[in-house]
């Protein structure tokens, strides 16, 4: 299994729609010249952006967090350019980018150090072969202070690993429950 380069990412995105929308360079400034947390293709990965759609965890209903029976009322929906995550809490968001993962590729997501150095951890499970959709992002604020997430800017990096052989059964083949997801998707069983 080998990690894929910027050339491969560019070709797969431009010719096969692997990443849409796709930024062919690292974008570090907005149209007004203001600094951004970078996004776009890098040497061996692709930095994704966070959309304006957030679900921030709240315990106002004193619910028990149960992945088998998740209560949607545990979140407050926010649409904004900035999301404030309360201390020691978390939020869900989604990528602006829509992904179509090839059958012989596994994609791993890592948080950007800009956020990690502030105590904000990004978690995403691997994008399996032939999975497609917007990626649901999980942000954990590990600090005892409120934390800010910026929509439209880089939040995580995707690394693409191509296998030497095609998998027998892809995510699409087994009818994965998150296949084709759009928007922020809550836990399913």
Swiss-Prot record:
Pfam families from the UniProt entry: DCD
Mind listing the UniProt keywords for this protein, alphabetically? Hydrolase, Nucleotide metabolism, Nucleotide-binding
User: Per UniProt, where does dCTP bind?
Assistant: 112-117, 136-138, 157, 171, 181
Q: What Gene Ontology molecular-function terms does this entry list?
A: dCTP deaminase activity; nucleotide binding
Q: Which residues form the active site?
A: 138 (proton donor/acceptor)
Question: Which SUPFAM superfamilies does this entry report, sorted A to Z?
Answer: dUTPase-like
Q: What is this enzyme's catalytic activity, as reactions?
A: dCTP + H2O + H(+) = dUTP + NH4(+)
- InterPro entries according to UniProt: dCTP_deaminase (IPR011962), dUTPase-like_sf (IPR036157), dUTPase_trimeric (IPR033704)
A GO BP entry: dUMP biosynthetic process
Look up keyword Repeat and say if it applies: no
Recorded metabolic or biological pathway in which this protein acts: Pyrimidine metabolism; dUMP biosynthesis; dUMP from dCTP (dUTP route): step 1/2
Q: EC number(s)? A: 3.5.4.13
Its domain of life reads: Bacteria
Matching CDD domains: trimeric_dUTPase
Indicate the transmembrane segments per the record.
none
Q: Which PANTHER family match?
A: DCTP DEAMINASE
* Family membership noted in the UniProt record: Belongs to the dCTP deaminase family.
Query: Briefly, what is this protein's role?
Result: Catalyzes the deamination of dCTP to dUTP.
Q: Which NCBIfam families match?
A: dCTP_deam
**Subunit (UniProt):** Homotrimer.
Q: What is this protein called?
A: dCTP deaminase
Whose protein is this, by species?
Answer: Acinetobacter baumannii (strain ATCC 17978 / DSM 105126 / CIP 53.77 / LMG 1025 / NCDC KC755 / 5377)
Encoded by which gene? dcd
């Amino acid at each position: 299994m080998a990690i894929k380069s910027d050339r491969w990412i560019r070709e797969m995105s431009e010719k096969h729609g692997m990443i849409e929308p796709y930024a062919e360079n690292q974008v570090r400034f907005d149209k007004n010249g203001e600094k951004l947390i970078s996004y776009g293709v890098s040497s061996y990965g692709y930095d994704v952006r966070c959309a304006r759609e957030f679900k921030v965890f709240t315990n106002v209903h004193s619910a028990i967090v149960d992945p088998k029976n998740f209560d949607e009322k545990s979140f407050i929906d926010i649409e904004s350019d900035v999301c404030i995550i309360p201390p020691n809490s978390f939020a869900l968001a989604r990528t602006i980018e829509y992904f179509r993962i090839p059958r012989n590729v596994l994609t791993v997501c890592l948080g950007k150090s800009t956020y990690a150095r502030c105590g904000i951890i990004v978690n995403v499970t691997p994008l399996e072969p032939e999975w497609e959709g917007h990626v649901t992002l999980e942000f954990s604020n590990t600090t005892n202070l409120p934390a800010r997430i910026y929509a439209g800017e880089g939040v995580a990096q995707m690394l693409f690993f191509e296998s030497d052989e095609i998998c027998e059964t892809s995510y699409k083949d087994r009818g994965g429950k998150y296949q084709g997801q759009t928007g922020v998707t809550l836990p399913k069983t």
